[in-house]
Amino acid sequence: MKKLIIVFVLLLSALSCFSQTEFTTCLFDTSRNRVIPLAVYQPHKVNLKTKVIIFSHGYDGNKNNKSNQTYAYLTRFLSQKGFYVISIQHELVDDPLLAMEGNFMETRMPNWERGVANILFTIQEFKKLKPQLNWNDLILIGHSNGGDMTMLFATRYPELINKAISMDHRRMIMPRIQKPLLYTLRGCDYDTDYGVLPTEKEQEQFRMKVVKLDGVTHSNMGENGTEEQHNLINQYIYGFLTWR
């Protein structure tokens, strides 16, 4: 009987580690006649101190209608750390494909602007749905093309967010501003376009952080990474989120 009680207690302890709630839902932006699918990772305890993270996935060729769920290693980890995570599905099957040539600051801008509109609408609606959350310290995170969207949002709506993190974005120039605090994790296999990343002097001036991860490629930051690589990414991102 004593052994059964111990096993039961251990099971409860294990379950408590995964006690956050995950669900999918959709918003509808009538002004753009657009559905915005979401994956939500809600921590066990939610109150006025609970910070919100808006996550934006990398480009997937409009082929995967669950791209926003392929970064669960990160979104679940952050939820377990007490953050309320909303992961946006930016690509719909009938969307125009992402430009693969030309000046990307011009040819990809319509895609990024659509992403910025998705993020802004999601923030506006969830402020109504979840007013009990901490919206004063809003955080954006994005990988690759989602990181480009994140940096464009930080450029256009800096007053709405506290921190923004890109995971190996390569095209959108990071704004040289002190608020929000900006952070980027760099893979080891691709360079960025000219001027995207701040110089060392600019990093110091604007309190921006650029961190290169040796042995972690661009695709490793998505679902193709190993558990060890994902754990490393998680720790770097969590470290920045708790940095003041």
Where are these regions (language model features)?
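Serine-hydrolase catalytic machinery in alpha/beta-hydrolase-like enzymes
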Residues: 33-129
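Short, proline-enriched alpha-helix->beta-strand connector loops that line the catalytic pocket
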Residues: 176-181, 205-207
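Boundary at the C-terminal end of the N-terminal hydrophobic targeting segment
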Residues: 17-19
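Short alpha-helix in the alpha/beta-hydrolase fold that links the catalytic acid
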Residues: 179, 190-202
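C-terminal catalytic histidine-bearing segment of alpha/beta-hydrolase fold enzymes
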Residues: 207-244
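Sec-dependent N-terminal signal peptides
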Residues: 4-13
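Short beta-strand/loop motif that positions the catalytic acidic residue
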Residues: 183-185
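Primarily recognizes the serine-hydrolase "nucleophile elbow" in alpha/beta-hydrolase
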Residues: 121-177
